[in-house]
Each structure stands twice: as C-alpha cells, then as structure tokens.
Design a protein with these regions (language model features):
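Cyclic nucleotide-binding regulatory module and flanking cytosolic helices
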Residues: 1-41, 86, 90-91
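Cyclic nucleotide-binding regulatory domains
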Residues: 18, 43-105
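Short loop/turn motifs at secondary-structure junctions and domain boundaries
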Residues: 28-29, 45-49, 195
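Cyclic-nucleotide recognition modules
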Residues: 78-133, 140
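Polybasic "coupling" helices that flank or enter modular domains
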Residues: 104-105, 122-188
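Phosphate-/nucleic-acid-contacting segments
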Residues: 154, 162-232
Length: 232
C-alpha cells in the first residue's frame, strides 16, 4: 500500500502511463522518494544556476520559466500548467538550471529525485518513451515561441499562447489576462484588446479569470499566418 505522503501526488504518479507498468516495490519506492515544493504567486520556486535535483511536475497552479540575458533583460518563454512535467533536459544532463521557475499563482511542485530518474531511464522502456515524447513536445513549443516572438503581431502571439500545442489539457483555460500577458510578453491592456477581438471573431469566449477556446484550428491558422515583424 502506498504511503499517504500526499494524495494528489500519489494520484498524479498513478496516472502516468510509465508508472503503471513498474513493479509494486518500485512504485512504492517512487512515491516515498518524491518531494513537494509549495509557493505563492511571485515566488521563485527554483532558481537559475542551481544544480538540478530531479525531474519536476506542476501538481497544481501555474509557473513560468524565465531566463535572464547577460544584460539583465528577463524573458518569460513558457508557462507550465498543473499536470505537466518540465526540466527533463536539465535532469538528463545533470547541469545547472538555466532559468528561474516562478509561480504565477499558488503552486505546488513535485520532484522526482535524480537517483530515481536515472534508475528509471536505465530500466524502463515506457519511461524512456515518455521522455522522448516530452522532449519532442518541448522542441515543437520552443520553435513556435521563437518564431512567434520574433516575427508575429500581438494578436498572433496571443493566439499562439492559447493554442493546443502549448496547452494540452481542457479547453477552458484558467488563465488571467495578466498571466497571459506575462507569457506572451505583452501588456495587460494589449492582451485585453486582443482577446476582445478574438472573441468577436468567434475564436474564444471570455469569463472572469478564464478563456474558453471555441476554435482551436482558427487560433492555429491565425498564429501561423504571415505577419508583420513584432516591435522590439
């Protein structure tokens, strides 16, 4: 029987496809070995430059991955919602973290320790398949973000950050305009104007603190259409 360190953490692990195929003793060892990290909005949960301690997942909440240039310019380039893993590349290379992980709302992280991460990579085909899928997804996201931030209009940036290639869960996103602006690199006022325009076009509907996606393909078409170069 699994130890009750955290019912959400146990349920989260049991929902992972690679976890189900492990022997019971390995499952129990993993559940006992994970650690939890909590933070409020604005907290830096994990710091750039620290040695990576494991593979992380967002149990609840929302975080942004934020890098800082040598000139001190900060850039938030990806949001990670509840239910998703992140940091697999750094865990595989066992390097210093290249970005800060900052809570955009009250958040809880789960950490699978490096020792267990290595053990699973060495022994579990299903775990390695999950890692490959995760890395492929992140590569696609990174390429889309780079292209959009360099070449696209504010409307296309917002459409991209609402797209299914960045959010794989429910199509009712519990995402505030402030959070969306942080991720897209736009002011809250600009995001508000853009969302109103998308709503008028029938691509989204807006509720308090939530954006409902009505037309995934329409958002994708908008995000990938030829656009003007974004302002620096």
């Amino acid at each position: 029987m699994f130890p009750d360190i955290s019912k959400p953490a146990t349920r989260f692990l049991q929902a992972q496809p690679w976890f189900a195929g492990l022997p019971p003793d390995a499952q129990e060892r993993i559940v006992r070995g994970v650690s939890l990290h909590q933070g409020a909005k604005g907290d830096v949960l994990l710091h750039a430059g620290e040695r990576v301690q494991g593979w992380y997942a967002v149990l609840s909440g929302l975080v942004k991955l934020q890098s800082c240039s040598p000139e001190g310019r900060r850039s938030a380039y990806l949001g990670i919602p509840g239910g998703e893993w992140f940091g697999e590349g750094s865990a595989m290379k066992e390097e210093e973290r290249r970005y800060d992980v900052i809570a955009l709302r009250e958040t809880e992280l789960l950490c699978l320790p490096l020792a267990e991460f290595r053990r699973l990579r060495a022994a579990s085909l299903a775990f390695n398949q999950a890692l490959a899928e995760q890395l492929n997804m992140r590569l696609g996201q990174a390429m889309a973000i780079i292209e959009t931030m360099r070449l696209k209009t504010p409307e296309q940036r917002v459409a991209m950050y609402l797209g299914r290639h960045l959010w794989h869960g429910p199509r009712k996103l519990g995402l505030s305009q402030e959070e969306l602006g942080i991720l897209a690199g736009l002011s809250r006022q600009t995001v508000n104007l853009v969302l109103r325009g998308l709503e008028q076009r029938g691509l989204v509907s807006l509720e308090f603190g939530r954006v409902n996606i009505l037309d995934d393909q329409g958002l994708m078409d908008l995000a990938t259409a030829p656009g003007s170069r974004a302002a620096p």
